Amino acid sequence: MPSCYEHSAQSPRPLSVLAEYFPKGYSVFYKANTETCPEANQYSKALVDFYTQELNQAEDTNLTLGQMGLGDGVSLLLLWQSLLQCRKNNPELSRLKVHLLIFEPHAISALELKQLWQALGLFDANSPVAPQAEQFIAGKMAQINGAQRFILEQGQLRIDVHFGDLHSNLTELMTPEHRVTHWHCLPHIAHTQTEFAETQASQLQFNQVQSNANQLNQAILWQMGRLSQDNASLYLDGENFKPSASDNNALTDCTLIKMATQAGFSRYSPNLFQASSDSCNAIPLGERRALRQQQENRQAHCPVPNSLGERRQAVNNSDSIAIIGGGIAGACLALSLAERGKAVTLYCKDDKLGDGATGNRQGAIYPLLTPENSHLSQFFQQAFLFSRRRLLALLHEVYPIGHQLCGVLQTGFDERSEARLEKIIQGQHWPEEIAYAVSPEQASALAGVSIDKPGFYYPNGGWICPFEFARACLEKAKSLANVEVKLNSTISCIKPLAANVDSKDASGCTSQASGTLWGLYHQGEIVGSHQQVVLASGASITAFEQTQALQMSGFRGQVSHVPSKGELAKLNTVICANGYLTPAFNSTHCVGASYVKDPEHLDFCSDEQAENGQKMQQSFPNLEWPQDIDVSDRNARVGVRMVTRDHFPMMGCAPDIEEIISRYQTLNASPQASQNNYAKQCQQYWQQTPAPVHHNLFVLGGLGSRGLSSAPLAAECLAAQLCGEIAPISATTLALLNPNRMWMRKLLKGKALC
């Protein structure tokens, strides 16, 4: 009987079981021999024709499509193929950016999806979508709840796959400016499939989701409507939506049409892609607006750029967005903005990029997990996978980035840490693509050196050279849009400028933008002016008047560089125990790091160097290879990482803390403050009143020790918000990332601020 730490390889669910989940006839790919699958060929041709029509008729440079159900995933490949063909046939579509939102109640891994696609012949030499299929599978889609974003074709195709409860995932998305134009509903989402759920649940190991949450219902359709344009279409496949005679719970065509009409979808069809009337009913459209306003009221304490409460101020692609900071956060944001065609000016105080905390030679990349799989844990799983995709995309274009996706082995190093790790392992049925428990023997085989205790292994983790990653992001950004990097450019102060005052932007041109501009200063001299400014300056992010109260602290970290020799040279995975140790890179390992709050200096410290040399010996006192860690040559690097108490990064609008405190004091000084229900009224005020912010000033920081894992997704979400798009994280997570969260938590609970 294996112990709880011994790993037994999990095989993907049998193809026969997966095929039973996806209704017969759904596999839509047109095979080479159409006689063997004429229905699939007809379906896929109609789907490609539909996608081609919608792509060619797109009225904006941004086209957002929704899909209820992932199914066997072939439909996303057909959209991808259609986009490539349309761009080839119509050069004017080169600027079109397509965003596909997929909502699927039953999670499926990349390994299982690969198994399905292999059975369909999608990887065959004569398959027109083989390159796309291979690229998507390499993205390591995992069986986790929430969104997983895939950025493809130089940012021209973004696919968000949302696994989990349909209604919850839809409800948790903030209403965007760029709303869904068309919805495509796959057959298995229309059926309750009660009998199937009862007989196959144990085999499929699906999340225990109620049957009626897995199908279209009125509540789900209303949330789809909230996210949609007024004239958005809802397409249904009539043949596959027809319930069997034995299924009394399945939805009928008439029921679907009625529900779609009530939710305000102007065009729908029980027959494949045959659109009906374009007329819009004022009543359901009014209901949609009410739903949007309700969400806005619920989330008022968490201001989002370009939301209903903070009306979008037109920013042309030619108007440069300023990013202050040349580390991993600023570089990732520049890339995400460039993929959207935005001009960027990045100010870096150093003479080279990535010279702060990003300057370490090797940094571990793996998710932070908690026993209860909290929002923090879910965010880091999403972020880790997205960061990995970013890395692979840059490597595919031959950008030089030192890295090794060699896995990460986590072990305890004392009784407390061992108990904590065991609690994490036992807390959830973790997807194998995220992490799995290993015995000491298995850990030793993975690490290449002897490990005498069990551990938790992250197979898709590893290490990345942070500064090379950051520089590659910026080089890629420069190839996509007007991105300028200004080195040796210290910004010590930012002040609002009146719009009617002639001021030069970063390119030396007089800005014509309406509204307030931000002036960037150093030693009293203006360096530039921009309509939108993002502070992503790492350890100096709280050096500005507007951000000095942000609740994050600087921690010094000294990482020691040790020569690769002896048994240590055999190490081939990252070890995280009391500190971390990397495999060799250019004949040198990294071990560390120290953790000193509010450091007085960043000079080399002999004591910290010695402590680093002891970390692995303390973790594995009975083993010999840690003795090969030699720190005597005083080779090390020191940086400061900004850490928040709750371990979430800070991303979003810069809060106006003075105004928050002023309003708080005014409310407390009110004559009604002594009334019994006044505290509840104050809580309601803070819940529903837009929280004060510095308009068009944003924060991206507080990445702590896991910036390599969290920065790319946090930057992508901020870029999406700045451009009025749907971000790939929930409203709840956005609130947890918001820089004002420490104050809002107290105010929403009726607690005193000080």
UniProtKB/Swiss-Prot annotation:
Recorded hits in InterPro entries, A to Z, give: FAD-dep_OxRdtase, FAD/NAD-bd_sf, SAM-dependent_MTases_sf, tRNA_MAMT_biosynth_bifunc_MnmC, tRNA_S-uridine_synth_MnmC_C
Q: Name one cellular component (GO) term.
A: cytoplasm
- Output the Gene Ontology terms for molecular function: flavin adenine dinucleotide binding; oxidoreductase activity, acting on the CH-NH group of donors; tRNA (5-methylaminomethyl-2-thiouridylate)(34)-methyltransferase activity
Annotated stretches, region: FAD-dependent cmnm(5)s(2)U34 oxidoreductase: 324-754
Q: What is its main location?
A: cytoplasm
Catalysed reaction, written as an equation? 5-aminomethyl-2-thiouridine(34) in tRNA + S-adenosyl-L-methionine = 5-methylaminomethyl-2-thiouridine(34) in tRNA + S-adenosyl-L-homocysteine + H(+)
Region tRNA (mnm(5)s(2)U34)-methyltransferase, residue ranges: 1-320
Q: Would the keyword Flavoprotein turn up in this protein's UniProt record?
A: yes
- Keywords annotated in UniProt: Cytoplasm, FAD, Flavoprotein, Methyltransferase, Multifunctional enzyme, Oxidoreductase, S-adenosyl-L-methionine, Transferase, tRNA processing
Q: Cite the EC number.
A: 2.1.1.61, 1.5.-.-
Q: Where in the cell is it found?
A: Cytoplasm
One of its GO biological process terms is: methylation
State the needed cofactors, names only: FAD
- Disulfide connectivity for this sequence is none
The entry's family comment says: In the N-terminal section; belongs to the methyltransferase superfamily. tRNA (mnm(5)s(2)U34)-methyltransferase family.
Q: What does this protein do?
A: Catalyzes the last two steps in the biosynthesis of 5-methylaminomethyl-2-thiouridine (mnm(5)s(2)U) at the wobble position (U34) in tRNA. Catalyzes the FAD-dependent demodification of cmnm(5)s(2)U34 to nm(5)s(2)U34, followed by the transfer of a methyl group from S-adenosyl-L-methionine to nm(5)s(2)U34, to form mnm(5)s(2)U34.
Q: Which PANTHER family match?
A: SARCOSINE DEHYDROGENASE-RELATED, TRNA 5-METHYLAMINOMETHYL-2-THIOURIDINE BIOSYNTHESIS BIFUNCTIONAL PROTEIN MNMC
**Which HAMAP family does this entry report, sorted A to Z?**
MnmC
Protein name in UniProt: tRNA 5-methylaminomethyl-2-thiouridine biosynthesis bifunctional protein MnmC
Q: Which organism is it from?
A: Shewanella denitrificans (strain OS217 / ATCC BAA-1090 / DSM 15013)
